[in-house]
Amino acid sequence: MRKALLLLSVLALFGCSKAVNTPVLTIEGGQVQGVTTELPGVIVYRGIPYAAPPLGDLRWKEPQPVVPWQGVKLCDKFGHPSYQAVHYPGGYTTEWGYGDESPYSEDCLYLNVWTKASGQPDKKLPVALWIHGGGYREGWGTEPEFYAEEWGAKDVVLVSINYRLGVFGFLTHPELSAESPHGVSGNYGILDQIEALKWIKKNIAQFGGDPDNVMIFGQSAGAGSVKTLCESPLARGLFHKAVIMSGGGLNIPQAAPAAAPAARPGAAPAGRPAGMPANMSAMRFRPMNIKEAELATKEVMDWAGLTDLKKMRAASTETIYALSTIYNGASGKYGSITGSPMVDGYVSLESFDDAARDGSLADVPYMIGYTLNDMGNMSAGIAAFCENRQEKGGKAWAYEFARPLPDDGSHPEVTARLKGAFHSSDLWFVFKTLKYCWRPWTQGDWDLSEKMLTAWTNFAKNSDPGLGWEPCTKENPGFMLFKLDANDAEASEVGTPIVP
C-alpha cells in the first residue's frame, strides 16, 4: 500500500510539472524547454540527449555527436536507462521504488538538469554531475532517491546521466581494438561520462551553470567511475572537485579500521559486523587487464558464431545481454564478458591507487566516505587516501554515515537484506529525497538530511563542506560522523568522529 501511495505521489508530482513560462534554451542539437518542479523557481530538463544513440554500427564505439532535432524539445520525460536485467521485488528494488522507469534500452545516452537559473548564463552557479552506481551493470540516474530539486533550490545546477552498462558499456574484443584509432576497446561507459562532462563544458552556461566550477560525485560503481575519471587523462580539466561515496580509498591488504591515538571521549570503538569481508570495496574497483578481457570475450563470441563485428553488431540486444549466461550453462565453462572499467592505455593509464601514489591523480579537492554497514572495511583505505592527498599538497575530507535506517515492519522483503546503515542508505539523505521513501522518518532524519545536503552543496560551491568539518590528515585523522545520536555510532570504525 505504501509503495502504491509513493508511486501515486511521484506520478502526481510529474503530472503537475508544467512548461508554462519556462525558458526555451538553445543548446547543442537544438532547443529545449524544461518543466517546473514543486520547489519555487527550480526547473528540471528531463531526457536531454548528450550523444547519438549507440545503436547499430555505433554499438561499442565512442559516443558520437548528438543528432539534431527540429523545433523545441519539451523535456518532461526521463530518457531510457541502459539495458539491464529486470528487477524483481525485494531488497534495493523495493527500497528505491523501481517499476515506473522508462523501458531499458541501448538508446540510453540522456541527461537531466535541475536549475534555478535557466537562461541566465551570467549566474555562473556551481555544477554537480551525478554518476549512479549499480555494479556497472544496473541502475540509472533518475531513480527516485536521485531527484535533485533540493540541489537546485540550494543554487547548484545538478546534472544526472545514464550511461552504457555491462556488456554494452565495457565489452572488449580484439576486432573492436583493431577497429579503434586508439587500438583499444571497452570503457565505453566511462567515455559516455566524459562526453557528458564535455556537454557540460559546452552547454551548461545556458542553464545558469559555471563550466569552470564542476563537481563530479558518485556512489558505489558511480564512485568507481569517479575514481577512473580522476585518473583518466581524457577527463582532465573537465571537473574541479570530486566526491567518492562508498567506493573505497586506497587498497591496503588486510587493512584494519582507521583509529586515532587520541579519540574523543565517548567515541565508538573500532569494529565491523561479523562476517563482513575486509577491504572488499577497494579491491572491487581495481580496473581489469584489457588483453585478458579481450581473449575472454572472443572465446564467448566465437562460441556463439559471432565471429566478426558485423555479426556482433547485428545481434539483438537480448542475445548480446544473455550470451555469457547461455555460454556458461551450455558449455560447462565459465565465460567472462567485460563488465567494468579497465586500464587500456587510452581512457585509463593506470589504477587509481597507482595514480594517487605516483602523483598523477587529478589535483582537485576530494570528499570521500562510506556507510557503517557498507561492503567491507573502508575506513583505513579512506584514511590512507586522505594522507596521500596531504602528502601531495592537496586536501580530502572523510566521512562515515552511521544512521541505521528506520523500519516500521511493512517491508520485510527489504529489511531482511538491507540492515542498519547499509550500502547506499545515505542516498536518501544526500539528495534530501526522504519523502519518496516508504520508511518512517523522524524529524531528526530530516534535519540530518539537511546537514548532509548542505555539506555536499557547500563542497560544490566552495570546495569545502563547512559545518566545522576539517580535512582528514595524518595529524588530524578525523571523519565527519553523520548520525542522529550516540546509539547510531556504537559500532563506528572511526577513531576521531566529528559530529555536525
Where do the protein language model's features map onto the residues?
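Glycine-rich nucleophile elbow surrounding the catalytic serine of serine-hydrolase chemistry
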Residues: 218-228
